[in-house]
């Protein structure tokens, strides 16, 4: 999706200039912490279960107990709505933390803490998912079969942002509604009239 910046005041900013922090534990594993996964507990979010637009809690589900969580995440608790980004295999998936359950940020996935005086979590998710940004990421990605992005790559990414936070909210809400409509039509095939044989078929 391409945003039309004609009718409101937008600006172009480098991604890293609108962030207060990047939460990045990509090299961390239970083994390196001399601990192990548990049967239940805090779900780990990785590039396998962070999909484009949502978190699939059933895929590659690993859990950590309270001790593993505290050692791993320290004081960087993820919060509802925070933007997640997969850096490799697959590269460029964008989703938001679905609730305030304490998740473990795991393999090939990072989380952004935006400067909320400049950009909202919701709009950050929207603009990172947009086709323009995704194409820029692909063009700048390194690696062979498994493309990936480094922090240097992220520093080169530019975002088109409304200067008004209320305008960001409007755009985010519109995109959310459009996504819900698209998902609804994908999940519920509708009947249409077949003009050739006079019957009906699934479209």
Ranges and model annotations:
Residues 10-14, 157, 161, 175-177:
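Long, compositionally biased tandem-repeat segments
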Residues 46-47, 60-129:
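A short beta-sheet element
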Residues 16-19, 32-69, 112:
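DNA target-recognition patches
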Residues 1-12, 187-203:
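Short amphipathic coiled-coil heptad-repeat segments
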Residues 87, 103-110, 142-167:
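A short glycine-rich beta-alpha junction/loop motif
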Residues 17, 169-181, 185-186:
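Extracellular/lumenal glycan-associated surfaces
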Residues 4-28, 165:
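Non-catalytic DNA-recognition/assembly elements of restriction-modification systems
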